[in-house]
């Protein structure tokens, strides 16, 4: 989940430029996505998340022996190059889809929508990965792992958003 979880902060950090919706409105006269969803953010967020995943793959064999008493080391060596791309890219797609629906509901950019704001990227990462690499997803995200992710991710998400806000990369701390 680390590549998926870090894709969004990297998108915010390196984003800006041309909005994905090109500044256009939907048929409800509201922006399709808003200025916060840009091509540069999508590209660099996805690339950075993928690079983080690649780093995980490269380090896993070296870290596994030290974690042997805590987790099964074989869990650290099962990787997928498809998931390496789909997890961060899917995370950003999940955020984009959520933004689309927030605009339809009348939420402005930066408006808080609890739970959806924290778990949109998890849903996007899992859905895209399930569509393109279901075997890897189901092998790595058992029901207990999925529950743990759903419970833990919101805490990390809020912490990263507060950090982004304090660094001046986000307009709001959520």
Swiss-Prot record:
Q: What reaction(s) does this enzyme catalyze?
A: 2,3-bis-O-(geranylgeranyl)-sn-glycerol 1-phosphate + CTP + H(+) = CDP-2,3-bis-O-(geranylgeranyl)-sn-glycerol + diphosphate
Q: Which pathway does it take part in?
A: Membrane lipid metabolism; glycerophospholipid metabolism
Q: Which InterPro entries match?
A: CarS (IPR032690), CarS_archaea (IPR002726)
Q: Name one GO cellular component term.
A: plasma membrane
Could you tell me the membrane topology recorded for this protein?
A: Multi-pass membrane protein
The keyword Methyltransferase is assigned to this record:
no
List keywords of the entry alphabetically: Cell membrane, Lipid biosynthesis, Lipid metabolism, Magnesium, Membrane, Phospholipid biosynthesis, Phospholipid metabolism, Transferase, Transmembrane, Transmembrane helix
What superkingdom does the record give?
Archaea
Q: Which PANTHER family match?
A: CDP-ARCHAEOL SYNTHASE (PTHR39650:SF1)
> Briefly, what is this protein's role?
Catalyzes the formation of CDP-2,3-bis-(O-geranylgeranyl)-sn-glycerol (CDP-archaeol) from 2,3-bis-(O-geranylgeranyl)-sn-glycerol 1-phosphate (DGGGP) and CTP. This reaction is the third ether-bond-formation step in the biosynthesis of archaeal membrane lipids.
Q: What is this protein called?
A: CDP-archaeol synthase
Per the UniProt record, the source organism is Methanocella arvoryzae (strain DSM 22066 / NBRC 105507 / MRE50)
């Amino acid at each position: 989940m680390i590549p998926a979880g870090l894709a969004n902060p990297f998108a915010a950090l390196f984003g800006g430029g041309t909005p994905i919706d090109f500044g256009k409105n939907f048929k409800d006269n509201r922006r399709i996505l808003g200025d916060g969803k840009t091509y540069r953010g999508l590209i660099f967020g996805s690339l950075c998340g993928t690079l983080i995943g690649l780093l995980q793959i490269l380090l896993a064999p070296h870290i596994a022996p030290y974690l042997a008493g805590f987790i099964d080391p074989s869990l650290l060596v099962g990787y997928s190059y498809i998931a390496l791309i789909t997890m961060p890219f899917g995370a950003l797609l999940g955020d984009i889809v959520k933004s689309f629906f927030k605009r339809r509901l009348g939420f402005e950019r930066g408006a808080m929508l609890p739970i959806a704001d924290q778990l949109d990227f998890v849903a996007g990462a899992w859905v895209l990965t399930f569509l393109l690499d279901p075997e890897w997803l189901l092998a790595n995200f058992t029901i207990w792992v999925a529950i743990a992710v759903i419970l833990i991710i919101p805490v990390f998400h809020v912490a990263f958003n507060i950090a982004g806000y304090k660094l001046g990369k986000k307009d709001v701390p959520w």
